[in-house]
Amino acid sequence: MENSKILIRNAAQIVTCHGDKARRGAEMSDLGVIEDGAVAMSDGVITHVGPTEEVLRNIHAEDYLEIRAENQAVLPGFVDSHTHFIFGGYREEEFSWRLRGDSYMSIMERGGGIVNTMKATRESDFDTLWDRGEERLDELFSMGVTTVEGKSGYGLDLQTELVQLRVMSDLNESHPMDVVSTFLGAHAVPPEFAGRTDDYVDYMIEEVLPAIRAEHTVTFCDVFCEKGVFSLEQSERLLRAARHHRFKLKMHADEIVPFGGAELAASLKCVSADHLLHISDTGIKRLARAGVVATLLPLTAFSLNEPYAPARKMIDAGCAVALASDLNPGSCFSASIPMMIALACIYMKMTPEEAVTALTINGAAAVGRASEIGSISVGKRADVILLKYPSYKFLPYHVGMNLVDTVIKDGELYMM
């Protein structure tokens, strides 16, 4: 439903998550909650935020579509800052193998894993990838996600990487959600470069990066920096080349073993370092010092039955922590934002306040958009969600249940 002016009034809580940059350490506990609050928006932009009586004194309420939210909490739209939602095929057999005890890396080493999805994605046409991608965006949108990051990395050649990124660009134009695109050509080494990882990195740098940049639709470059995949030196070489082409930088770091990926991300001042299940204490300190967002993916640790990233230690050390789904066909075939929040609180020892911050303003910072989205602040885009309950604390408490009642995206109203 479209309306140029919307007023949410008498909300049990307006959870503002105020600010225009990532919140670090103890700052993550400050949600800026307004009780009996109101939010006014016009032409897709937030114009007034505050106690209901104050907002009503400053607007002509009769000009607005009113939503009375006496028993509802109102939050910024969620930002899912790490996904791989465009892919062909599925890997349900590999999930069964992992249940029998096979490790993620052992499956990858014998031709499964990412290369398995690469084959299916290369065989998929644009329309099929688009249709499946739209379905996944719809699922995320229904759970309150208004901005999503999506990675390529299942083509591992120029042609298919471009197809993945063009699908994301097209969905960004056609779907209510915003899609922030990331080039992840260095996700694995394809069979045609087996045993020649340095040559593959050269190919990425010399041929693929310039062609991706020419598309003018891709914001980030990412790399899977991991033992047995891309070394620290190879990762740094690729990321420095990407920066030369004016990409912002991300890293998959320290997911499988302690590898020094977080330290590299800090030295390169990446926007975010992601996964971090096996980050070192030194890596934590350097991420905090460098201001790199630590994007943690509890659904993946759950799906792989691996130890969770040390969120509590990171926050206490002054890191800015974000949470994301890591939706992908292999290590985490789930987009369950509600389950992710519960896992973060129960197993990673994050408080409900920290989890909300991690999925809003810090998620926005992880995609370089904290000045536009991620908080209910005057001048920001009108990306707002209403819950079915009167407090944000129901998010981890009502485990695994979708509590989103209404989504407002760019000032347009969607009833879930």
UniProtKB/Swiss-Prot annotation:
GO MF annotation terms: imidazolonepropionase activity; iron ion binding; zinc ion binding
Function description: Catalyzes the hydrolytic cleavage of the carbon-nitrogen bond in imidazolone-5-propanoate to yield N-formimidoyl-L-glutamate. It is the third step in the universal histidine degradation pathway.
Gene Ontology cellular component annotations, sorted alphabetically: cytoplasm
Native organism taxonomy: Bacteria, Pseudomonadati, Bacteroidota, Bacteroidia, Bacteroidales
Species the sequence originates in: Parabacteroides distasonis (strain ATCC 8503 / DSM 20701 / CIP 104284 / JCM 5825 / NCTC 11152)
Cofactor: Zn(2+); Fe(3+)
UniProt name for this protein: Imidazolonepropionase
Reactions the enzyme catalyzes: 4-imidazolone-5-propanoate + H2O = N-formimidoyl-L-glutamate
UniProt keyword Iron present: yes
Residues reported to bind 4-imidazolone-5-propanoate: 91, 154, 187, 255, 331
Keyword terms of this UniProt record: Cytoplasm, Histidine metabolism, Hydrolase, Iron, Metal-binding, Zinc
CC cofactor note: Binds 1 zinc or iron ion per subunit.
Main location group: cytoplasm
